[in-house]
Amino acid sequence: MIERTLDHRFLPGYVAFPGGAVDDEDAPLAGRWFGDPREAARAAAVRELAEEVALAVTADAVVAAPVEGPLAPVHEAPPPRERLAEVARWIAPTQVPVRFDARYFAVRMDGAADPTPDGAEAARAWWISPRSLLSAWAAEDVLLYWPTHFTVTALAACRDADELFGLRIETREPDEDELGRFPRSVFFQDR
C-alpha cells in the first residue's frame, strides 16, 4: 500500500493501492508486453507500480526496479497477461470532483522486494494484510477512500490466494446506509 503525499492533487494523505491514469505510452507497452494494445490499463498498473514504489512485475517474480529505467526488468521478462488478475473496477460517481475509472489488479508473488516510495506521489509504501489495514482504518490510523475500502474488505474475506485471484468485486456506488455509517473521509476529500 502507499500513503499519498500531502501535496497530492487527489486524496492527499490517504492510503491507496499504487496506480494512476493510463498514459499514452501504455498502449504500446501493452502491445509489447501482452501482445494487445487494448490492455493499456494492465500495462499502466505495471508501469505505475514501478514508478511509485520501485517494484517491477516480471514473468516470474516481483523484483526491485532500478531507479534509472524502472521498467527494464519488465522489458527483459514481460509478465503474461494472466499474471495480473483484474479483481475490481471502480468508476467515480458524477459528484466526485476528480473523475476516475480505476481498475484493480492482483499479482502472485513469492518473497517480493520491499516497496520504496517515490516521494512524489507516495510518501510511504509498505506491505500490510487486508485485515491489518482495516484494523488501522477502524482505529483511525489511516484514511481510506471508498473504492479502496470496499476492495480491501473483499480481499480480507478471501480464505487464500486462489480465492483472491478468482475474485471479481461487484463495483457499485456507496448506498445510503454506508454514507451514514462510515466516516465522512471515506467518501469525501476534506483535506
How does the language model describe each region?
Residues 1-72, 131-135, 139-143:
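Conserved Nudix-box catalytic region and its N-terminal flanking loop in Nudix hydrolases
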Residues 15, 24, 28, 66-191:
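Nudix hydrolase/Nudix homology domain
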